[in-house]
């Protein structure tokens, strides 16, 4: 299988891209793959990775209900309209992140796994380093703008491969 990532137009360098063979890690194409970029909603790939880790370690269950905070309710712009005080299952939060890029669901997961989204982002960065994502720094679980939240196309390819290898049971 081939994995590829392209980052959108940026003035100083038109784009970043990488295509790798996920079976052997061979780079088939690369352009500015080590250039720092804002990850935007690709951040949610790590949010999902962290949720899959927690599921694998039995720290959470798919049918477990998570409480929606005011902060989660207030997330914009892409969301499913969760209301503070209501609950969503882990499974539905994951599906909302995958299908809608739901920032409210990503925040609920983050707060449930680490008390606050800031603590969760620190754990995301730590996990990134463990996976070999040397230039990645997360500041939130959603990818909403933060000037210190950066990654590279190469690092996102590493995360993609880790998702496929370490959490293939969640792909169906």
Give the positions of each predicted feature:
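Acidic/histidine-rich, surface-exposed loop or edge segments in extracytoplasmic proteins
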Residues: 26-34, 103, 107
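Active-site-proximal loop and beta-strand segments within enzyme catalytic domains
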Residues: 52-119
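A short, well-structured edge-of-sheet supersecondary motif
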Residues: 9-30
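A conserved catalytic-loop motif detector
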Residues: 89, 93, 101-172
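Extracytoplasmic/periplasmic beta-strand context in beta-sandwich domains
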Residues: 15, 64-66, 136, 171
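A short glycine/serine-rich beta->alpha loop
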Residues: 32-37, 143-146
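Active-site SXXK
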Residues: 25, 38-66, 156
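Bacterial N-terminal signal peptides
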Residues: 1-6
